[in-house]
UniProtKB/Swiss-Prot annotation:
<dbReference type="InterPro" id="IPR050175">
    <property type="entry name" value="Complex_I_Subunit_2"/>
</dbReference>
<feature type="transmembrane region" description="Helical">
    <location>
        <begin position="326"/>
        <end position="346"/>
    </location>
</feature>
<feature type="transmembrane region" description="Helical">
    <location>
        <begin position="13"/>
        <end position="33"/>
    </location>
</feature>
<feature type="transmembrane region" description="Helical">
    <location>
        <begin position="59"/>
        <end position="79"/>
    </location>
</feature>
<protein>
    <recommendedName>
        <fullName>NADH-ubiquinone oxidoreductase chain 2</fullName>
        <ecNumber>7.1.1.2</ecNumber>
    </recommendedName>
</protein>
<dbReference type="GO" id="GO:0006120">
    <property type="term" value="P:mitochondrial electron transport, NADH to ubiquinone"/>
</dbReference>
<comment type="subunit">
    <text>Core subunit of respiratory chain NADH dehydrogenase (Complex I) which is composed of 45 different subunits. Interacts with TMEM242.</text>
</comment>
<feature type="transmembrane region" description="Helical">
    <location>
        <begin position="84"/>
        <end position="104"/>
    </location>
</feature>
<dbReference type="GO" id="GO:0005743">
    <property type="term" value="C:mitochondrial inner membrane"/>
</dbReference>
<dbReference type="Pfam" id="PF06444">
    <property type="entry name" value="NADH_dehy_S2_C"/>
</dbReference>
<keyword id="KW-0830">Ubiquinone</keyword>
<dbReference type="GO" id="GO:0008137">
    <property type="term" value="F:NADH dehydrogenase (ubiquinone) activity"/>
</dbReference>
<dbReference type="InterPro" id="IPR010933">
    <property type="entry name" value="NADH_DH_su2_C"/>
</dbReference>
<keyword id="KW-0999">Mitochondrion inner membrane</keyword>
<feature type="transmembrane region" description="Helical">
    <location>
        <begin position="240"/>
        <end position="260"/>
    </location>
</feature>
<feature type="transmembrane region" description="Helical">
    <location>
        <begin position="178"/>
        <end position="198"/>
    </location>
</feature>
<feature type="transmembrane region" description="Helical">
    <location>
        <begin position="149"/>
        <end position="169"/>
    </location>
</feature>
Length: 347
């Protein structure tokens, strides 16, 4: 891609998300969503492959439908209250339609079907942007609307998302699909606590972005897209194999790694709000995610395939642009569980 074009597209993606997050008027929120959507399409079609074109088309159709529902909800609220302010959405029907529209944009169940297909059809870097940065804008609007959202609707979607994210990833061998189902599950955890503690949703999102970014950067460095290609990592670079193991277990929420912290804090808040059954159910559903991540780490680090590699084992990383950002990301993704009491006090 031309450097000037790439700079313009990246700037538009960042600007669109920033407009959505900082806006207090529904019209500018809609403009920000549209800027972001139109700018991400060339990023998804970067490889000029039929699968990338198909993925970009699916993404466009889903996001356009969600934007249409968003404007429908805004119009209904405008007719009933005469307000354009984001914080003044009080009409129950408008709130329900808005919640469904934002759920489509986030990929929450039962609107999750596009997430694995689109992620599988795009390059790893595009998949990283799709599963991390693209979650910021819709989730920020959900946090703003959280005091008025119907608890039954949002909790139903969060429970379904955790279940679908766990069950869907069990029989997958494509790493991008596994990361997509992991994203669906994490979105379920974030929305489960949304109506009780929106700031904890933001903390969960930030940690999820850190862990997912670390995993994707490692996959980009090793050029791994399937479990078979990932299984050769130990023969080439054992250090990367060990880091992938710990990062994936952290994504699964295994203590004493970072990924256990948001789950711990969310379950604690749910039990404080007397949602014992919901917290127990979500803790059990989280085992599904942990299972397929454990299976991945077994394939990656606990088995060694026959190899004819006659070169010396490469303990060092390749000198790449992505490797420079790995050190802080790895530390954040795996080692900040001891900060949980501080995080609980702050969030």
């Amino acid at each position: 891609m031309n450097p000037l074009t790439f700079t313009m597209i990246t700037s538009t993606i960042i600007l669109g998300t920033s407009i959505v997050i900082t806006s207090s008027h529904w019209l500018t929120v809609w403009i920000g969503f549209e800027m972001n959507m139109l700018a991400i399409i060339p990023v998804l079609m970067k490889t000029h492959h039929p699968r990338s074109t198909e993925a970009a088309t699916k993404y466009f159709l889903i996001q356009a439908t969600a934007s249409m529902l968003l404007m429908l909800a805004v119009t209904i609220n405008l007719l009933s209250s005469g307000q354009w302010a984001v914080s003044n959405m009080i009409d129950p029907l408008a709130l329900t339609i808005m919640t469904l529209a934002l759920a489509m944009k986030l990929g929450l169940s039962p609107f999750h079907f596009w997430v694995p297909e689109v992620t599988q059809g795009v390059p790893l870097l595009s998949g990283l942007i799709l599963l991390t940065w693209q979650k910021l804008a819709p989730l920020s609007i959900l946090c703003t609307l959280s005091p008025n959202i119907d608890p039954t609707l949002i909790l139903t979607m969060s429970i379904l998302s955790v279940l679908v994210g766990g069950w869907g990833g069990l029989n997958q061998t494509q790493l991008r699909k596994i990361m997509a189902y992991s994203s669906i599950s994490h979105m379920g955890w974030m929305t489960a606590i949304l109506i009780y503690n929106p700031s904890l949703t933001i903390l969960n999102l930030l940690l999820y972005i850190m862990m997912t970014s670390t995993t994707f950067i490692l996959l980009i460095i090793t050029s791994s897209t399937t479990t078979l290609s990932l299984s050769h990592t130990w023969n080439k670079t054992p250090l990367i194999a060990i880091i992938i193991l710990t990062t994936m277990l952290s994504l699964g929420g295994l203590p004493p790694l970072t990924g256990f912290m948001p789950k711990w804090m969310i379950l604690q808040d749910l039990t404080k709000n007397e949602n014992i059954a919901l917290s127990l159910f979500m803790a059990m559903a989280a085992l599904l995610n942990l299972y397929f991540y454990t299976r991945l780490t077994y394939t990656t680090s606990l088995t060694m395939l026959p190899t004819t590699n006659n070169t010396k084992i490469k303990w060092h990383f390749k000198t790449t642009k992505q490797a420079a950002s790995l050190s802080p990301l790895i530390i954040i993704s795996t080692m900040i569980l001891p900060l949980t009491p501080t995080m609980s006090a702050l969030w």
